[in-house]
Amino acid sequence: MRHDHIISAKQLSRGDIETVLDHAADIAADPGAFADRHSDTLLGLLFFEPSTRTKMSFTTAMKRLGGDIVDMGSVESSSVKKGESLADTVRVVEGYTDALVLRHPMEGSAKMASEFVDVPLVNAGDGAGQHPTQTLLDLYTIRENAGFDDLTIGIMGDLKYGRTVHSLAHALTTVDASQHFISPESLQLPRSVRYDLHEAGAGIREHTELDDILPELDVLYVTRIQAERFPDESEYREVAGQYQIDGDTLAAAKDDLTVMHPLPRVDEIAHDVDETTHAQYFQQAHNGVPVRMALLDLMLGGDQ
C-alpha cells in the first residue's frame, strides 16, 4: 500500500481490509513495538471542516509511530481565507510533509486533491461523499465484537447525507454482510450508493421502523441527522429526533447486540444505553488510533 492514496472505501478489497485490521490488532496488542517506526515522518493535516475524533486520532497515531504533524489550523487563519484554491494549498503543504490527511466540505475534493500531489493522501471526509478511515475502524470494531461470519447489521439514521454510511455500506459487501437500512423516506440512501451496492451484488433492505428488524440484528449502527448538510433548515426540522433508542428500545434486541455510532451523537442514543453491554461507540472511537496507525504505517512503507 506504499504511496497509495486512500480516497474511498470502494477501492479497498477484502484482502486490503483484512491487512489493515490485522495490522491494527498487532499494534493494539503491543503499541510500543511501533513507537519509532516513522521517527522522521511529518503528517500534514488539512481540515476545512470541524473535527474532534478524526483529527485527534490521526495526530495521536502519527505521534505514536514516532512522527509528528503539521497542522494547517483553521480555515480562518490560513491563505484559504484569501482565496487560495484547494489545488494550490495541497501542492504547497505537500512540500512540507510526507503524507496528507484532508477533510473538505466538497464531495469529490479528496479525489481532485490527490491528482495534484505525489505524497500519500488520505480522505478524512469529503462532504457527503466518503470517509474510508472511519469505515476501517468501524469494521475493526465489528470484527472484534460480532465477527464477519453471517453478520446482520442495521444502519439507521441519516443515510442520505451520512458519508460514514456510504463508505461502510460498500465495504460491508466485501464481507457478505446482510445489511438493513432504517431511515425516513426522505433520508434513504442516495442513488449513487444504491447503484454501487447493486453493482456489488448486495441487496438493499429498507425499513422505516427499527422494530421491524431489531431482533435479528448483530450490530446496530446509529448515525445522527446531519443538520449542516440540509439545504433547507425546515427539511431538517421535519426529521430531527425521529430515530432515538434507549434502554427500553433494546429490550427486544439480542443479548449480544453491538450498538455503534461514528459520533458525535445528538439525541439519537439515550445516555442510559452507555451503561449497557451493547454500547461500543466509545471503544469504536478509541479504535481509531491503532487502525489509523496501521494504515499510515502500511502507506508509508511498513513491513506488514
Swiss-Prot record:
Family label: Belongs to the aspartate/ornithine carbamoyltransferase superfamily. ATCase family.
Disulfide topology: none
Pathway: Pyrimidine metabolism; UMP biosynthesis via de novo pathway; (S)-dihydroorotate from bicarbonate: step 2/3
Keywords: Pyrimidine biosynthesis, Transferase
InterPro entries recorded: Asp/Orn_carbamoyltranf_P-bd (IPR006132), Asp/Orn_carbamoylTrfase (IPR006130), Asp/Orn_carbamoylTrfase_sf (IPR036901), Asp_carbamoyltransf (IPR002082), Asp_carbamoyltransf_Asp/Orn-bd (IPR006131)
Record Gene3D superfamilies: Aspartate/ornithine carbamoyltransferase
Protein's name in the database: Aspartate carbamoyltransferase catalytic subunit
Broad enzyme group: transferase
Keyword Transferase: yes
Role description: Catalyzes the condensation of carbamoyl phosphate and aspartate to form carbamoyl aspartate and inorganic phosphate, the committed step in the de novo pyrimidine nucleotide biosynthesis pathway.
Domain of life: Archaea
Catalytic activity: carbamoyl phosphate + L-aspartate = N-carbamoyl-L-aspartate + phosphate + H(+)
Entry annotated with the keyword Transferase: yes
Gene Ontology molecular functions: amino acid binding; aspartate carbamoyltransferase activity
EC number: 2.1.3.2
GO biological process: 'de novo' pyrimidine nucleobase biosynthetic process; 'de novo' UMP biosynthetic process; amino acid metabolic process
Binding site for L-aspartate: K82, R163, R224
HAMAP family per record: Asp_carb_tr
Residues at which carbamoyl phosphate binds: R53, T54, R103, H131, Q134, L263, P264
Subunit structure of this chain's protein: Heterooligomer of catalytic and regulatory chains.
